A protein has these predicted regions:
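Short acidic/glycine-rich loops and adjacent helix/strand connectors
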Residues: 1-158
Length: 158
């Protein structure tokens, strides 16, 4: 299995053949999620929890507190139901763009797991991940893309 990650500027791609399960942690805004992909690149189950503001938009600190409160339970549930911790060969996490306090929670969980398991830690650009999943699913080799996401809206061509 090849795990790809891009720098925040989307310029440099790194690939790493990990040969086993990769846990992925998403924490860019209102959702904290942990999922996995197997050695053939087939995604498994993911478990998520969302912040639902009563009024207005997402408050970054409240969302981060939510993520911190739920991270352990989500990880425990995934490991109990889906994943043998001994088969995990890498930890991937959303490194941005996103809400700073939320990103820090995800990065901390990811770093802790990678350190405990002595496996590689791979930061993934949130924008690039959306684009690459879409590109892979449609089978496009050289698309021109419109990525419309608030302050991160871009027209992208290789």
């Amino acid at each position: 299995m090849v795990l790809q990650s891009s720098s925040p500027s989307c310029d440099a791609n790194r690939s790493r053949d990990v040969g086993g399960i990769v846990l992925g942690i998403e924490s860019t805004a209102h959702t904290f999620s942990i999922g996995w992909v197997d050695g053939l690149g087939v995604p498994g189950k993911s478990i998520s929890a969302f912040v639902r503001p009563v009024k207005g938009g997402i408050h970054p600190r409240e969302a981060a507190d939510h993520h911190a409160e739920r991270a352990g339970g989500i990880l425990a549930q995934l490991l109990n139901e889906e994943v043998d911790i001994n088969e995990v060969k890498a930890i991937a996490f959303s490194q941005g763009p996103g809400l700073g306090p939320c990103l820090r929670i995800g990065a901390s969980v990811a770093r802790s797991l990678a350190t405990k398991l002595d496996v590689p830690l791979v930061g993934v650009n949130h924008c690039v991940a959306h684009i690459e999943v879409g590109r892979e699913r449609c089978g496009c080799d050289d698309p021109v893309l419109l990525y419309a996401s608030g302050g991160n809206t871009q027209v992208i061509a290789r």
